[in-house]
Amino acid sequence: TAMVPGMFKNHFEGKNEFYKKIKTVMVVHDLNEYSDISRKDLELAEVPIDKMLKGDVLNSFDVGAFHANAIVVIDKPSDVISEKLLKQPGVAANKKKVSVIKASDDESPNYQMIADEMDQIFKKLSD
């Protein structure tokens, strides 16, 4: 999901009335080794890269943070990923967009509570 906000901005935002009110949300529920992507691959996919991001390999969450209208991070009791994610330069630069949802349990989280919190975040985007 981290590449979608930039792809949307680059290819669809402002193209016509249909896309005018669409907002993008980057949801992060897990950090893994697949979040690193080469700058060249991002450029080939025409994903815009903010000037502050340096290097040949970039973190996709950093890239997406600049273009998403909101960033939702779901922390688990055993893995508080929001703390790690907020140390990433692109996410830190966009911390005003970040909302953290704390899951109640690793194995059986309260999905209704998570959905309700996400719904509140989405409602703020449409105001």
Model-identified regions with their sequence ranges:
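Catalytic cores of nucleotide-sugar-dependent glycosyltransferases that transfer UDP/GDP/TDP-activated
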Residues: T1-D127
